[in-house]
From Swiss-Prot:
Annotated GO biological process: DNA integration; DNA recombination; transposition
Domain Integrase catalytic: residue ranges: 111-285
Domain of life: Bacteria
This protein's name: Transposase for insertion sequence element IS640
Record domain HTH IS21-type: where: 5-66
Family affiliation: Belongs to the transposase IS21/IS408/IS1162 family.
Alphabetical UniProt keywords: DNA recombination, DNA-binding, Transposable element, Transposition
Coiled coil regions in record: none
A Pfam family annotated for this UniProt entry: rve
Function as written in the Swiss-Prot or TrEMBL entry: Involved in the transposition of the insertion sequence.
Amino acid sequence: MLSREDFYMIKQMRHEGAYIVDIATQIGCSERTVRRYLKYPEPPARKTRHKMVKLKPFMDYIDMRLAENVWNSEVIFAEIKAMGYTGGRSMLRYYIQPKRKMRPSKRTVRFETQPGYQLQHDWGEVEVEVAGQRCKVNFAVNTLGFSRSFHVFAAPKHDAEHTYESLVRAFRYFGGCVKTVLVDNQKAAVLKNNNGKVVFNSGFLLLADHYNFLPRACRPRRARTKGKVERMVKYLKENFFVRYRRFDSFTHVNQQLEQWIADVADKRELRQFKETPEQRSRWSRNICSVTGYRLRYQLLRYPPCVLGQLYRGWW
């Protein structure tokens, strides 16, 4: 088989008027080959031929390992080499490659929860103008798993107290609490997560105990478990914070957010359900009712003379 350079030389010499016999002499091939190549619009692809003679005795073993979901060719190569295989790696890869389409998918299967069962929590960050100054705004997104309704709380810091305040505000906004709250492995909620053995932050456990929800943490390096809320973080960045870039204060940011959610976000159609979050929220009315919860850093805003009154009642 001739090379690509030979192919283009044949085309060029013929275009310049050279005889086929002269082209064949120059290239070093037969006149018949020259005529065949002149008919091709492009250089013919070189076919790689792999002889599987050396690999054939080990094919049953390789197929067994693939069925066990072992797809690393280096691992299989080492194993069959120890069994007496004398061929190379390329032959093994050539055999495995067409079978890779049989490999089980790594895609996460979306888990749909029942109404009032789960809330997913996550944080995002954008840079906007607040009170005439460019600054970073941290925003907590709390999304109901069933209806996809969400609440957003903007804060100057992404810390434990603002994490808890975002959940308190979300429960108050939704009119109740859910059975489980799914969080990322942020220090505000999770101190340690070792293969499912989770140590939660004591402050987060106090909040969970007060609202009677079960805290849950994502598996490490698998944040896509809470894909619903991560999509809402992206949705906010690409919609609300593109439309609104200037605010008078953080209070103004949160007012604008709640208004935008009511006017826009809750009225968007969810393609997989052909309903809006507002329509699906009618099924979430069975979420548990809540009482107020006062955060430690909020108490510091008041003088000692009124703290006693605040401790006697929840807002």
